[in-house]
């Protein structure tokens, strides 16, 4: 008879404890914060009442009574929980003695408070994870949009490259089908013949210069032939015609003038200095004063006049 009653009393205690924890969790979730802790009603098992009920046995009742914690006791328990959420036997006895509570009441309150603290911690973690998840979702959406934009740009660039390549291939194919250009015409041959590095025009110029009566070779040839005329025909016969006299007088003067100018040029090229330049000037003066110095010439015929 006693065994079923004990089993029923233990089942009733477990059921009451679970109901109390559920009520505490519900009140925490609905109220939230320290104000809810102060206003909530905590019901704990009284060990004295439970022991009396268990000893009575056949009284037919559990003999349990509930006690409500005061607001001051709840605040003191909150301060103790914030200091340390673990409850050892010595600390439990000290808190119970200070607050005039049963040690079992202190243990149940700490147990419920740890459950609420864990629930609140889970809620904070869930809120942090949810905010992070939302941020990641926004970032993922932005990355997806960027990916789509880049894919569209790549497709556009690929189309452009394909179009340019097709145009180039068509141009190359057209160039291959075109016939090659005709070869350039051969260069025209020159009519003038080159003989010993000089053309006919150069040869004719040299020939004309040699044939000219004013060239140096003609004058030199006439100068060398003049003394022979002195010996053969005589002085009077050489100057007999007036035209011959005029021509004979003109050629030596030109010869002397050319010799003076040639000497002047040699002095300037050879670097004879101021004296050489002065002599050259004197030679030039002698050329222009031909009548004064003509008496010194061997062929001058003034005495015969």
UniProtKB/Swiss-Prot annotation:
Keywords: DNA-binding, Homeobox, Nucleus, Transcription, Transcription regulation. This is Homeobox-leucine zipper protein HOX8. It is found in: Nucleus. Residues 62-121 bind DNA. Expressed in seedlings, roots, stems, leaf blades and panicles. Signal peptide: none annotated. Belongs to the HD-ZIP homeobox family. Class I subfamily. CDD domains: homeodomain. Residues 120-164 are annotated as: Leucine-zipper. The lineage of its organism: Eukaryota, Viridiplantae, Streptophyta, Embryophyta, Tracheophyta. It holds the Pfam family Homeodomain. Residues 1-70, 173-206 are annotated as: Disordered. The gene is HOX8. Probable transcription factor. Residues 50-62 have a biased composition (Gly residues). Its main location: nucleus. It comes from Oryza sativa subsp. japonica (Rice). GO terms for cellular component: nucleus. Residues 37-49 have a biased composition (Acidic residues). One of its GO terms (biological process) is positive regulation of DNA-templated transcription. Residues 179-188 have a biased composition (Pro residues). The keyword Transcription regulation applies. GO terms for molecular function: DNA-binding transcription factor activity, RNA polymerase II-specific; sequence-specific DNA binding. InterPro entries: HD (IPR001356), HDZip_class_I_plant (IPR045224), Homeobox_CS (IPR017970), Homeodomain-like_sf (IPR009057), Leu_zip_homeo (IPR003106). The keyword NADP does not apply.
């Amino acid at each position: 008879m006693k065994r079923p009653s004990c089993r029923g009393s233990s089942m009733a205690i477990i059921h009451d404890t679970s109901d109390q924890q559920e009520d505490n969790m519900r009140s925490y979730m609905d109220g939230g914060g320290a104000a809810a802790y102060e206003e909530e009603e905590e019901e704990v098992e009284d060990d004295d009442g439970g022991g009396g009920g268990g000893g009575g046995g056949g009284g037919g009742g559990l003999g349990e009574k509930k006690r409500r914690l005061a607001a001051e006791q709840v605040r003191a328990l909150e301060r103790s929980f914030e200091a340390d959420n673990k409850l050892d036997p010595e600390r439990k006895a000290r808190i119970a003695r200070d607050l005039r509570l049963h040690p079992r009441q202190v243990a149940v309150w700490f147990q419920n408070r740890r459950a609420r603290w864990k629930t609140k911690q889970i809620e904070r973690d869930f809120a942090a994870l949810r905010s992070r998840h939302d941020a990641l979702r926004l970032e993922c959406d932005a990355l997806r949009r960027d990916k789509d934009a880049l894919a569209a740009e790549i497709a556009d660039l690929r189309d452009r490259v394909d179009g340019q390549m097709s145009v180039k291939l068509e141009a190359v194919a057209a160039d291959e089908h075109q016939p090659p250009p005709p070869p350039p015409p051969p260069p025209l041959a020159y009519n003038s013949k080159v003989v010993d590095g000089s053309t006919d025009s150069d040869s004719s110029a040299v020939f004309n210069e040699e044939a000219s009566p004013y060239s140096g070779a003609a004058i030199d040839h006439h100068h060398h032939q003049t003394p022979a005329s002195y010996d053969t025909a005589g002085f009077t016969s050489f100057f007999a015609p007036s035209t011959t006299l005029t021509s004979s007088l003109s050629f030596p003067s030109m010869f002397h003038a050319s010799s003076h100018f040639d000497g002047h040029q040699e002095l300037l090229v050879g670097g004879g200095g101021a004296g050489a330049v002065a002599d050259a000037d004197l030679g030039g003066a002698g050329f222009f004063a031909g009548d004064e110095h003509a008496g010194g010439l061997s062929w001058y015929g003034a005495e015969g006049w």
